[in-house]
């Protein structure tokens, strides 16, 4: 099992690549308490043409459709999400792997209302 405290590399969070150890979420994050968030599971494989993400467009579209279903506005375009998913393998020197793009509400407020959160 991986010891995540000792892991190195980068995570894309809030629109920028941050060091693994700096990617932290507050304990009062709305999604942690109420479960309102969306995610995908995306796999990349090493091919003769380099690293390729399996059905990237389908995964990204599904993420955005899931967000739309719960009235969650994603502050990035689908194109940006696709770029970042490709880039995360490069910045971490990975040829293959699994990533979990997720969108969640932060700790700007608590309570059942989520229409005022980001």
Would you name each region that the model predicts?
Residues 1-118:
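Conserved alpha/beta cores of soluble small-molecule-handling proteins
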């Amino acid at each position: 099992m991986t010891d995540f405290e000792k892991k190195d590399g980068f995570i894309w969070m809030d629109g920028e690549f941050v060091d693994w150890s700096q990617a932290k979420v507050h304990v009062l994050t709305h999604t942690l308490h109420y479960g309102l968030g969306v995610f995908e599971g995306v796999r990349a494989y090493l091919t003769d043409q380099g690293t390729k993400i399996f059905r990237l467009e389908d995964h990204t579209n599904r993420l955005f459709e899931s967000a739309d279903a719960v009235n969650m506005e994603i502050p990035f375009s689908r194109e940006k999400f696709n770029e970042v998913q490709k880039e995360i393998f490069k910045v971490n020197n990975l040829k293959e792997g699994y990533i979990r793009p997720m969108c969640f509400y932060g700790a700007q407020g608590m309570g059942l209302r989520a229409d005022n959160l980001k």
